[in-house]
């Protein structure tokens, strides 16, 4: 543990050495390792199909024995789970490091990046293995949803989607470095390329869900007995929707640490979006109790991540919502409205999630969130929260009905409701992006020193001009970060227009200390102290005992490293990320739709042939005296295997 703390301290001392892209050395190492790993992966998969490489055979049989599923589903899903856990741990550690220490000089200077890269590569590898492990000569080969690659090679739909989502995330890494070179290092979770990394990994769960539907159908239509262990099935029904809930909650990270750089209304909107999509889909697709199981898995995973990042690694604590009320609502509605009427079920769930569930999350923010939702935001929270919950629940009902389409009738109105809801969600997420930049607000700050030593701290008294400048504000905080920790202190009102910190704030070293104000659609900041940064370059901000300063856009304070480019470069960069994102979303929608419309189709006895496959000529019996082949392994009866079918 001491060596781990030493490595983190080393990051802190070298963090300011770069404010653009990674060094040529880091790029060379990353490119070489990634290229070599991709080549090995592709050659290994193709070699396994041609039976020239047998390395995967042991893993193939092992995954079948422990799960009871065919290897083209069990091995990729197991690898994807491990990879997602690795990536999400790296993500939360990485965000905490940036909040506490600031930017890093390169890819390999931050140990959390290794976990993220390994996890994303594992996701891509899982999808590729699923594509390569499906064999047409097996009775349990993928069914009619499979995508034809060659005459006798059909890839599982879920495997292709996992591979695509992993590739989308991996593409975010080189684009992120390119973005830093153009616009500086964006120390925010919601940087465009950062969202690519998060979004691709989170949406991998959709590919896993589809491949699980495919394997159930394939085993059923093959006439083979279902040998999936009961504990595997029950665990899958918990971790799959729970994992999707964890993935969708990562987008709320701007608010989990208490340093949001976007409007606070996003927080309830994103919570309602995750609850509506995930919990409604889980109940419609998987049956009773699955929404509660998903929330239990979510709380366990996020709790473990919080303990690892905060208690074990000594970084800032990431907070999270509960979703318990929303899960109870979904399970309760199912007693009144049949899930076989998904349109009505989704609408009722959305209405209750957007009212009762929203009220529960409102209360939870006042218990365990760094920035609670104030009553000044009540009206817009009700409007946007309710609208988002209904739209998300209709999308979740559509997803659940597609994944469980063998027992839930198709609904054309539900399909169009989901399309309209998707457009509404996009519009609602885009609306709060626009913020007010100009302001005439200023403040006089008086600092009462608490510790006058080299680690100077002080109580700040802030007098606003005009005095009503913070009336109806959504937050008014003193924030100090990137100096070895994080402080988010909600100011105490002393009198009209006069506010005071409730604890001393740091005014030394690498700390960046400021007053932050969010009122209406304006997010403003006033610097109190900041060190000089020659890498950008920017001069330091001194903290005399008394001073007057204006407020301005707090993006200039929180993203000191950011720089502007010509308009065509900026629009071109954003358009590139947008096209990639729309491609991922289109792939997900197409995959979910395809798994639904093929539910009633029967698989042909042999792909591409309208009748039974041609009979094979009998192979000659081997001569026992000259037979040098290895005997087939004999597994215990309780370890079923699909190998050789």
Predicted ranges, named:
Residues 81-101, 126, 164-183, 204-207, ...:
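Hydrophobic alpha-helical transmembrane segments and adjacent interfacial helices
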Residues 30-47, 114-132, 195-213, 269-286, ...:
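Hydrophobic cores of alpha-helical transmembrane segments in multi-pass inner/ER membrane proteins
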Residues 2-26, 92-114, 175-195, 223-225, ...:
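Membrane-interface interhelical loops and short amphipathic "cap" helices
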Residues 107, 145-162, 170-238, 253-259:
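Membrane-interface helix-loop-helix junctions at boundaries between adjacent transmembrane segments
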Residues 410-436, 645:
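Internal/C-terminal transmembrane anchor helices
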Residues 18-35, 71-82, 104-125, 153-161, ...:
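Membrane-entry segments of alpha-helical transmembrane domains in multi-pass membrane proteins
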Residues 49-75, 135-157, 215-237, 402-414, ...:
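Membrane-interfacial, low-structure loops and terminal tails that flank and connect transmembrane helices
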Residues 433-602:
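N-terminal soluble domains immediately following signal/targeting peptides that reside
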């Amino acid at each position: 543990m001491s060596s781990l703390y030493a490595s983190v301290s080393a990051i802190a001392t070298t963090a300011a050495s770069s404010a653009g892209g990674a060094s040529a050395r880091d790029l060379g190492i990353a490119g070489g390792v990634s290229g070599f790993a991709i080549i090995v992966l592709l050659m290994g998969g193709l070699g396994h199909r041609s039976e020239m490489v047998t390395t995967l055979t042991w893993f193939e049989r092992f995954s079948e024995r422990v799960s009871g599923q065919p290897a083209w589903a069990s091995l990729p899903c197991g690898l994807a789970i491990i990879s997602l856990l690795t990536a999400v741990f790296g993500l939360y550690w990485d965000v905490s490091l940036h909040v506490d220490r600031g930017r890093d000089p390169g890819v390999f200077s931050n140990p959390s990046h290794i976990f993220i890269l390994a996890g994303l590569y594992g996701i891509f590898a899982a999808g590729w293995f699923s594509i390569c492990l499906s064999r047409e000569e097996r009775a349990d080969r993928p069914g009619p949803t499979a995508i034809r690659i060659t005459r006798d090679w059909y890839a599982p739909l879920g495997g292709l989607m996992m591979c695509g989502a992993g590739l989308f995330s991996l593409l975010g890494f080189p684009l992120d470095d390119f973005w830093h070179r153009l616009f500086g290092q964006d120390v925010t979770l919601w940087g465009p390329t950062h969202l690519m990394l998060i979004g691709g990994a989170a949406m991998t769960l959709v590919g896993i869900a589809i491949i699980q539907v495919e394997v159930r159908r394939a085993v059923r239509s093959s006439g083979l007995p279902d040998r999936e262990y009961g504990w595997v099935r029950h665990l899958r029904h918990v971790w799959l929707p729970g994992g999707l809930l964890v993935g969708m909650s990562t987008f709320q990270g701007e608010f989990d640490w208490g340093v949001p750089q976007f409007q606070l209304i996003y927080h309830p909107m994103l919570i309602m979006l995750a609850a509506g999509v995930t919990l409604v889909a889980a109940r419609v697709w998987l049956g009773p109790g699955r929404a509660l199981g998903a929330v239990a898995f979510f709380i366990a995973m996020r709790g473990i991540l919080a303990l690892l990042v905060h208690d074990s690694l000594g970084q800032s604590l990431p907070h999270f919502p509960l979703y318990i009320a929303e899960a109870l609502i979904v399970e309760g509605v199912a007693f009144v409205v049949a899930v076989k009427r998904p349109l009505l079920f989704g609408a009722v769930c959305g209405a209750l999630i957007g009212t009762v569930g929203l009220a529960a999350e409102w209360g939870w923010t006042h218990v365990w969130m760094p920035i609670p939702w104030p009553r000044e935001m009540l009206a817009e929270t009700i409007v946007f929260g309710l609208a988002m919950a209904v739209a998300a629940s209709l999308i979740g009902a559509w997803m659940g009905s597609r994944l469980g389409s063998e027992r839930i009738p198709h609904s054309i109105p539900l399909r169009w409701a989901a399309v309209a809801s998707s457009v509404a969600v996009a519009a609602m997420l885009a609306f709060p992006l626009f913020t007010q930049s100009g302001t005439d607000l200023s403040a006089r700050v008086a600092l009462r020193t608490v510790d006058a030593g080299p680690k100077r701290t002080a109580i700040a008294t802030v007098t606003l001009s005009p005095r009503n400048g913070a009336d109806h504000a959504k937050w008014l905080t003193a924030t100090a970060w990137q100096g070895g920790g994080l402080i988010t202190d909600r100011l105490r009102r002393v009198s009209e227009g006069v506010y005071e910190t409730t604890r001393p704030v740091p005014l030394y070293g690498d700390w960046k200390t400021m007053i932050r104000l969010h009122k209406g659609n304006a997010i403003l900041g006033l610097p109190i102290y900041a060190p000089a940064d020659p890498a950008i370059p920017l001069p330091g901000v001194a903290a005399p005992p008394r001073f007057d300063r204006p407020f301005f856009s707090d993006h200039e304070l929180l993203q000191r490293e950011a720089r502007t480019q010509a308009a065509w470069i900026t629009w071109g960069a954003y358009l590139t990320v947008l096209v990639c994102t729309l491609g991922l979303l289109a792939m997900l929608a197409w995959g979910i739709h395809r798994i639904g419309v093929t539910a009633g189709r029967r698989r042909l006895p042999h792909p591409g042939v309208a009748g039974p496959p041609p009979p094979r000529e009998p192979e000659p019996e081997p001569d026992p005296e000259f037979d040098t082949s290895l005997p087939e392994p004999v597994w215990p009866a309780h370890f079923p295997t699909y190998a050789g079918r």
